[in-house]
């Protein structure tokens, strides 16, 4: 009971900081249960983990607001935003040294993500957050913690997690928007589309460091030839530009909106909040933004559809390197994304390896085919669509070669799209491509077997399938992770560079990838399982049990967000320790 908590606080006041450890446990606060899950070691350490549980009966939310994963995730996102707004007003109002008085929850961006900050269970809602337990030096200041737990938090919780305290109409619109967005995404295949951009969308962002919509920007207007209408379950009829499956080229002068459109499409794999401007920019959920990554690690990837007959006789059907070139990195990225189940590739000429994308006629005359190991993307894009079902949306500004293979050509003119397919196709006959001989298209084969690196120990690790991955009886040394925002993280002594995994949008997703990779290395990498087998195991249990499945004690804190399966593949493929 909360009375006992108050008594405990008063009994440990002015004692040394470790006495806070005795507060771990559950406390009933009437209409919610407070759980102190982890107590920080000292006031300068990472803050303590605290959570609350509220029954569905007490929260009062309509059942249809959490009837499935989509609505449940959306409701949790809304509640997390409300709670974060409330607790930010009280952070550091309790005084002390170090992180004393810190009160913080997950800070959400423009996209809706599934976060451990708020989860819906059969019994109710669980919210997780961080609290800096106050101290003067390293002496407990329980009076200040009492303010947080008994004065500040109850107000924040009441205003954030109870239906009667919230704007019911705003929440309804929030849920209905998410359902409409998902309806469009599910409708795309039936309409033979890979993406949709609604009329009136605001695509430009406020600045390079802000993802909020730019004020006074030009609303998106679809060309008539590509305009379609969709009847949504809640909003009703909307119109916009449907991008057909196949090969789509986005062209135009500099600063006319080509990359802005592509950036909106790459984030269209996520649902967006009301007022974002891109609420109805919807992309195939499996879409992957690809680029060259000089220096990246590649292990056992079949890039032979793009690169063959290397001078060093390296086998490109099972290619490995510690320091990839632009072309080999982009080839590997495409093959890895195919393995990850992508049906749509998004590319920008500006961030691609030029020699990987195209070879002009003059270069083909100078460098004979048998002397060039690279089969450019230009010569594989049609096969990728016709034989593998993978569409491409490409931003191009310098080479006209792609006009010949494009099914749809969109010109961005001062942020206004124009369908110029017919007029460009007439011009193609005046600028024919030279005849080329391309080897037959074959789907790549996965070769990568994941083995545990030496630093994670060769001793016995019990995995969740109930078998053993090695011999021995001692407990293995656990690897530590350090997160660096969306740029990547370290696991043990290995750095995982995710700077160019552009659809990784939140540091909490990076933290989740660190958790998943750590689990894979410690429990699954045994020298027998392939990378796809391991990713599918991770994804299955993530979907069924959530991220807590991958922690040592099956408990999770605030600070994690679920990544897509495509980013899980990208993370494991970039881990040099395997």
Predicted feature locations:
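N-terminal accessory targeting/assembly segments
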Residues: 1-192, 203
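Flexible beta-alpha connector loops of hexameric P-loop NTPases
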Residues: 141, 296, 306-327, 359-374
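Carboxylate/His-rich catalytic cores and anion/metal-binding grooves
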Residues: 189-195, 199, 255, 262-293, ...
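N-terminal pre-Walker A segment at the start of P-loop NTPase domains
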Residues: 204-239, 274, 282-287, 291-298, ...
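Glycine-rich phosphate-binding P-loop
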Residues: 238-270
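Conserved alpha-helical scaffold flanking the Walker A/P-loop in AAA+ ATPase domains
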Residues: 325-337
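Conserved P-loop NTPase nucleotide-binding/switch module
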Residues: 337-381, 385, 398-404, 408-425
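Conserved NTP phosphate-binding and transfer environment spanning the P-loop NTPase/kinase superfamily
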Residues: 386-389, 395-578
């Amino acid at each position: 009971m909360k009375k006992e908590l108050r008594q405990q606080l008063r009994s440990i006041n002015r004692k040394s900081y470790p006495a806070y450890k005795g507060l771990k446990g559950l406390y009933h606060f009437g209409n919610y249960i407070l759980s102190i899950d982890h107590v920080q070691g000292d006031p300068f350490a990472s803050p303590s983990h605290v959570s609350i549980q509220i029954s569905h009966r007490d929260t009062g939310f309509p059942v249809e607001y959490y009837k499935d994963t989509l609505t449940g995730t959306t409701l949790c996102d809304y509640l997390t935003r409300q709670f974060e707004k409330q607790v930010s007003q009280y952070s550091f109002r309790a005084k002390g040294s170090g992180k004393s008085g810190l009160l913080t929850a997950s800070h959400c961006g423009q996209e809706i993500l599934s976060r451990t900050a708020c989860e819906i269970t059969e019994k109710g809602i669980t919210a997780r957050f961080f609290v800096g337990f106050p101290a003067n030096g390293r002496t407990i200041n329980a009076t200040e913690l009492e303010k947080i737990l008994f004065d500040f938090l109850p107000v924040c919780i009441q205003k954030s997690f109870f239906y009667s305290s919230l704007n019911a109409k705003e929440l309804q619109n929030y849920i209905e928007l998410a359902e409409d967005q998902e309806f469009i995404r599910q409708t795309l295949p039936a309409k033979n589309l890979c993406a949709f951009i609604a009329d009136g969308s605001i695509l430009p962002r406020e600045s390079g460091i802000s993802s909020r919509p730019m004020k006074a920007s030009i609303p998106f207007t679809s060309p008539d030839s590509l305009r379609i209408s969709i009847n949504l379950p809640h909003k009703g009829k909307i119109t916009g530009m449907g991008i057909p499956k196949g090969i789509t080229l986005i062209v135009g002068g500099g600063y006319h909106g080509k990359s802005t459109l592509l950036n909106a499409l790459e984030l269209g794999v996520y649902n967006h909040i009301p007022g974002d401007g891109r609420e109805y920019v919807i992309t195939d959920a499996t879409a992957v933004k690809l680029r060259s990554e000089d220096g990246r690690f590649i292990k056992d990837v079949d890039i032979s559809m793009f690169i063959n007959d290397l001078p060093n006789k390296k086998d490109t059907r099972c290619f490995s390197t510690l320091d990839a070139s632009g072309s080999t990195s982009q080839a590997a990225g495409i093959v890895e994304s195919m393995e990850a189940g992508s049906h749509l590739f998004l590319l920008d000429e500006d961030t691609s390896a030029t020699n990987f994308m195209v070879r002009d006629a003059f270069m083909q005359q100078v460098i004979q085919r048998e002397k060039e190991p690279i089969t450019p993307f230009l010569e594989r894009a049609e096969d990728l669509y016709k034989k593998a079902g993978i569409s491409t949306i490409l931003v191009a500004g310098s080479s006209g070669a792609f006009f010949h293979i494009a099914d749809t050509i969109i010109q961005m003119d001062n942020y206004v799209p124009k369908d110029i397919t017919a007029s460009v196709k007439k011009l193609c006959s005046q600028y024919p491509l030279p005849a080329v001989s391309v080897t037959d298209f074959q789907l790549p084969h996965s070769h990568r077997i994941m083995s545990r690196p030496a630093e994670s120990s060769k001793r016995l690790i019990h995995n969740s399938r109930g078998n053993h991955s090695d011999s021995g009886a001692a407990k293995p040394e656990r690897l530590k992770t350090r997160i660096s925002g969306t740029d990547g993280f370290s696991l043990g002594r290995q750095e995982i560079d995710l700077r160019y995994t552009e659809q990784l949008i939140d540091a909490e997703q990076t933290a989740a990838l660190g958790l998943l990779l750590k689990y894979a290395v410690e429990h699954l990498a045994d020298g027998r399982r392939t990378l796809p087998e391991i990713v599918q195991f991770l994804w299955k249990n993530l979907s069924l049990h959530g991220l807590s499945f991958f922690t040592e004690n099956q408990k999770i804190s605030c600070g994690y967000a679920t990544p897509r399966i495509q980013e899980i593949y990208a993370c494991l493929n970039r881990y040099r320790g395997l």
